[in-house]
Each structure stands twice: as structure tokens, then as C-alpha cells.
From Swiss-Prot:
InterPro entries: Wnt (IPR005817), Wnt2 (IPR009140), Wnt_C (IPR043158), Wnt_CS (IPR018161). This is Protein Wnt-2. Disulfide bonds join C74-C85, C125-C133, C135-C155, C204-C218, C206-C213, C276-C307, C292-C302, C306-C346, C322-C337, C324-C334, C329-C330. The keyword Signal applies. A lipid is attached at S210 (O-palmitoleoyl serine). PANTHER family: PROTEIN WNT-2, WNT RELATED. GO terms for molecular function: cytokine activity; frizzled binding. Keywords: Developmental protein, Disulfide bond, Extracellular matrix, Glycoprotein, Lipoprotein, Secreted, Signal, Wnt signaling pathway.
């Protein structure tokens, strides 16, 4: 069975769509186009996505501005990993051929990007940047929690509105294809959307005499996106390799000893490459030139990161804060000091 996405890869422009391997324009170039021009000229969008793009230009602009945030979070989560969520400036799409393989890395990218769109749109709604959405209109009147009664007030983040739009827009093409890879993408998209909603916090303000809390006004707010990133990284670590069921309508675990995936799990079909060396077919850029930690025993160690090729050591000078003193009240003053440190970088393949 062929699990290649066959044109269902990432689309990244002002909106996060799904890239076709035939796209020649880079995503940041498309992001500079006007919304009408962008919607009419990006190849690979199906009619439903193109229609939504034209109808909601400000939404597309907000999504485009938020792309760097989820990419940055992806790169943070994998900063000590052989695959570090690197982007391909000279390729036809942002992640090169990585997304052609139905790997756990592809599963993570689909999930974190879907979560990133939900987070971006929810925040834009709460800040009044978009038409047709604002704070959550359902959070009115009174309610209770473990601390007692409170009144809804402030601006509760309307995450359900963002989830609905993200699902309709991103999933449109996958629902049209309905092949094995499309079902994988739909599953991981949903896991990403659900992850954002998992970290909604109840925040409250007290009202009363002398700071007492006789009356509380509360609202629901999204946690920092880092929590979503941390959660999805754990899901990546425990992602479940699956095969299609006999009816072609869902998944079952590839190995009997593994649990059946639930809606929160990430799923994938194909094993990942080792990402040690540059390989165009798999989308691996290799680890040559990557900084490694000589004393670590983790994934950032020179032994693991460099895949046994060895490493080079260079002496570099860096600026650090030193001789810090507390000054009443209330500041800390430090000097800038220069120190020489060893930096270890992986050798390239011979």
C-alpha cells in the first residue's frame, strides 16, 4: 500500500493550507501577496478552501502571522534531536520531502500546525482583531468551581470558534481525498486541535473589602503555547504505528502488543529515517555541523547526534553576565565578561 501523501502535503502561505509537491513558489513569498491574489493563485487549494480564503482575508493574515510561532515551538521541542524541525529555504515546500513519508515527524508537524492555527485564531478573536468572533459568548452569568461560586466576566478565549474554523479549513482537502494518508492527517490534525483546548485555565479576580475575595469574576484563558508543545512532544514520543483496518475506514495498531490509538494519540504508518546523513528522498538534512554536548548522555550527546562520525572542537569567545550585585531597591547590576568556551560540532559524512 502506498502511504505517500500524493499532493496532500503542507500548504504554507498567509493561510496554512496543505502543500502540493508541485508548488514552485516559496511560502514566505506567497505570504506577501494580497489575499485575493493569494487565494486565486495558490495551486492545490480545493474550491472550499479557496472560498474560505476569499471570505476571510483577515483570518488568513492572522494565520500567516502566527506561522512562525508554531514553527518556533516545533524547533524548540526538537532542538536536541537529530531531526530539529528544520525548514528548507530552497525547497518547494517548507519541510522539503519530509512530509512525503508517513512518519511520526510528519504526524507531529500536522498536529502542531493545527494546534498553532487554533491558538492564533483564538488569540486574534479575544484581541478584537477579527470580524465575526470575539470573546466566548457562552461564558455569562454565574458558575461554580472547587473554591465556590463566581461570576463570568472579562474575556474568555473562544477556542471552540477557532477549532471549528481550523477543522473546516485544514481538513477540507483531506476529507476529499479519503485515502490512508488523508485519514492519518485528519487524525493528527484533530489531536492537535484538542491539545489546545486541554490547557484552558480558569483565571479569576477578587472583589471585596481590603482585598477579600467575597466576589470573584472569572474567565477562561489559554495557557502559553509551550504547554501545548510539551504535550504534543510527549505524544510524539509515544506515537502509535498503525495500519488501516480491513474496511479502510480507520486504524488498528501495527503490533498486537500496542494499544489501539485514541483521539489524543499521534499515529503514523512508516518508520523514520535515522536523520544522520543528508538524503533528499527522505527529507533528511543530516547532522553535519550541528552543535553537540560532549558530556551529555542524551539525544544531544556527540555520540548520538553525530551518529558515530566524530566531532570537531573549536574555541570561541562569548559574552556572559558576571559580578552581579543587588542594588537597593530594586535592581541587579552585572558586568559583561568574556569567556573562552569549547564548542563541539558534528563532522560531516565523508
Amino acid at each position: 500500500m502506498n502511504f505517500l501523501p500524493n499532493g496532500i502535503c503542507f500548504y504554507l502561505s498567509v493561510a496554512i493550507c496543505w502543500f502540493s509537491s508541485r508548488v514552485d513558489a516559496s511560502w514566505w513569498y506567497m505570504g506577501t501577496l494580497g489575499s485575493q491574489v493569494m487565494c486565486d493563485n495558490i495551486p492545490g487549494l480545493i474550491n472550499k478552501q479557496r472560498q474560505l480564503c476569499r471570505q476571510h482575508p483577515k483570518v488568513m493574515q492572522a494565520i500567516g502571522a502566527g506561522i512562525k510561532n508554531w514553527i518556533g515551538e516545533c524547533q524548540h521541542q526538537f532542538r536536541t534531536h537529530r531531526w530539529n524541525c528544520n525548514t528548507m529555504a530552497r525547497e518547494h515546500n517548507l519541510f522539503g520531502r519530509l512530509l512525503h513519508r508517513s512518519s511520526r515527524e510528519a504526524a507531529f508537524v500536522y498536529a502542531i500546525s493545527s494546534a498553532g492555527m487554533v491558538y492564533t485564531l483564538t488569540r486574534a478573536c479575544s484581541q478584537g482583531e477579527l470580524e465575526n468572533c470575539s470573546c466566548d459568548p457562552g461564558k455569562k452569568g454565574s458558575s461554580r468551581d472547587a473554591k465556590g461560586a463566581f461570576d463570568w466576566g472579562g474575556c474568555s478565549d473562544h477556542v471552540d470558534h477557532a477549532i471549528k474554523f481550523t477543522q473546516v479549513f485544514i481538513d477540507a482537502k483531506e476529507r476529499k481525498e479519503r485515502d490512508a494518508r488523508a485519514l492519518m492527517n485528519l487524525h493528527n490534525n484533530r489531536a492537535g486541535r484538542k491539545a489546545v483546548k486541554r490547557f484552558m485555565n480558569l483565571e479569576c479576580k477578587c472583589h471585596g473589602v481590603s482585598g477579600s475575595c467575597n466576589v470573584r469574576t472569572c474567565w477562561l484563558a489559554m495557557a502559553d503555547f509551550r504547554q501545548t508543545g510539551d504535550y504534543l512532544r510527549k505524544k510524539y514520543n509515544n506515537a502509535i504505528q498503525v495500519v488501516m483496518n480491513q474496511y479502510g475506514t480507520g486504524f488498528t495498531s501495527a503490533y498486537r502488543m500496542l494499544k489501539r490509538p485514541n483521539k489524543n494519540d499521534l499515529v503514523y504508518f512508516e518508520d523514520s529515517p535515522d536523520y544522520c546523513i543528508w538524503d533528499h528522498e527522505s527529507g533528511s538534512v543530516g547532522t553535519g555541523g550541528r552543535v553537540c554536548n560532549r558530556t551529555s548522555r542524551g539525544t544531544d550527546s556527540c555520540e548520538v547526534m553525530c551518529c558515530g562520525r566524530g566531532y570537531d572542537t573549536s574555541r570561541v569567545s562569548r559574552t556572559t553576565k558576571c559580578e552581579c550585585k543587588f542594588q537597593w531597591c530594586c535592581a541587579v547590576h552585572c558586568r559583561d565578561c568574556q569567556e573562552e568556551v569549547d564548542v563541539h560540532t558534528c563532522k560531516t559524512q565523508s
